[in-house]
Amino acid sequence: RVTDSAASGTALSSGQKTYNGAIGVDIDTLNVKTMLEWAEEKNMATGLVATSTVTHATPASFAAHVDYRKKEWQIAEQFAETEIDVILGGGKTFWPDELIKEYENRGGQFIESIDAQLNPEKRILGLFAEGALPTVNEGRTPTTTQMADMALNKLEQNPNGFFVMIEESQVDWGGHAN
């Protein structure tokens, strides 16, 4: 049996094998500690960058705990309650206005443009498309490099170091299309 992005993302982020579709849980649906959560315990800065929705299987596997990968609304709710310093990618459709307000009330800054003026004292949630970002051939803005630069510039300010997961999600999708 071939693994999927949720199970492989969970294995990559935690060292724990699990079933296809699982995000941050083991085969008994018990939460597993991820590298991102470990980094936060060490007072390191943390970030997630993806060209898919930020709540998609691979990025979600580093910070969420749900029994099935398609629960992107629930994953967004969990993200809003975390202390992740930078979350950049697509998926605004899974972040209703009330959830974005909750995120902002918890000390976050919501942006929809890579050129937004950032508040250095706030965590960043950048959602640049309703769903996944457009492909490069479709004129993707922002680019993976632009998002990575924004994340790294923010995260490197932490004297304890940082952990960031950067996924060029659409490489995976290209593989599925072949």
Question: Predicted segments — roles?
Answer:
Residues 1-94, 99-117, 122:
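N-terminal catalytic scaffold of extracellular/periplasmic and nuclease hydrolases
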Residues 29-33, 145-152:
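Short, hydrophobic/amphipathic alpha-helical packing segments
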Residues 36-40, 48, 151-154, 169, ...:
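Short secondary-structure boundary segments
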Residues 57-62, 132-139, 157-178:
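Active-site His/acidic residue clusters
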Residues 68, 140-148:
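Phosphate/oxyanion-binding active-site loops and adjacent basic polyanion-contact surfaces
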Residues 83-84, 120-135, 139:
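Formylglycine-dependent
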Residues 90-92, 129-131, 168:
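Short, structured patches in soluble enzyme cores that scaffold and shape functional sites
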Residues 103, 111-127, 147-169:
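Active-site regions of oxyanion-processing enzymes, predominantly non-cytosolic
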